[in-house]
């Protein structure tokens, strides 16, 4: 019979601490505002909108995640790698 108290899901290896909810007051202390709705963005003037977009948090994706550029590789170095 399977003992449910010692199942693999109760193991320390499978347990993960939940991600805490985001406290918006901490963001305000850092000078970052919470993302605003699309309706509020459309009512702003165009030059002011660019300034606000820099301060807002964007949703993480691999597209907007900055990575260090690959340095130029000399052909001799490249042939040594192969």
Curated annotation (Swiss-Prot):
InterPro entries documented for this protein: MLLT11_fam, WRNPLPNID
Signal peptide limits: none
Location of the motif Nuclear export signal: 24-32
Post-translational modification: Ubiquitinated, leading to degradation.
Entry annotated with the keyword Cell inner membrane: no
Primary role: Cofactor for the transcription factor TCF7. May be involved in lymphoid development.
Protein name: Protein AF1q
Record organism: Danio rerio (Zebrafish)
Gene transcribed to yield this protein: mllt11
């Amino acid at each position: 019979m399977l003992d449910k108290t010692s199942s693999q899901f109760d193991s320390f290896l499978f347990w993960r601490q939940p991600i805490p909810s985001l406290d918006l007051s901490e963001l305000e202390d850092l000078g970052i505002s919470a993302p605003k709705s699309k309706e509020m963005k459309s009512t702003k003037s165009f030059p002011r909108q660019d300034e606000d977009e820099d301060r807002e948090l964007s949703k993480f994706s691999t597209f907007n995640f900055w990575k260090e550029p690959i340095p130029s590789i000399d052909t001799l170095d490249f042939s040594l790698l192969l």
